[in-house]
Amino acid sequence: AYLYRDGKLHQITEDQSMVGEMLRAGAITEEQARSHPYRNVITQAVGTEERLSPVVTRILKTPGDIWLLCSDGLTDMARDEEIAAVLADCQPAAAAEELVHLALQHGGTDNVSVLLLEVKA
């Protein structure tokens, strides 16, 4: 999940994957993570284990916030700066389509799922 607020894109959740853990530990760079052979090996997912260890974060909503929920089909193909530029330039309905188009333009072969939620006053 990402939060677009005041012209900046913030990653709220962290990938619960082998590569995500390596990245957080400083063992690899973001560039290495993008093409790492284990980038799709997940360490926790709903429905795979009897017990989960969810990470819960509370964030106060602010009018104008845009929440982005998306699959790695988007984030593997588009950089945060590109995603932020689309969110800055388009209304949410158009931005969702534009983000899918952006991922496909960059050669995306994975499924691309995008959900945008705009916080109103």
What spans do the regions from the language model cover?
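Conserved catalytic micro-motifs used in adenylation/nucleotidyl-transfer and phosphoryl/amide-
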Residues: 1-5, 11
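A short local loop/turn or secondary-structure capping micro-motif enriched for an aromatic residue
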Residues: 1-2, 18-21, 77
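Short loop segments at secondary-structure junctions
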Residues: 6-8, 119-121
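Residue-level structural signal for beta-strand termini and adjacent loop
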Residues: 7, 14-15, 83
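Conserved, helical-rich catalytic subdomain that frames metal- and/or nucleotide-binding sites
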Residues: 14-63
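Conserved beta-strand-loop-short alpha-helix elements that form
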Residues: 41-50, 60-86, 100-102, 106, ...
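ATP/nucleoside-binding phosphotransfer catalytic cores, i.e., glycine-rich phosphate-binding loops
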Residues: 92-93
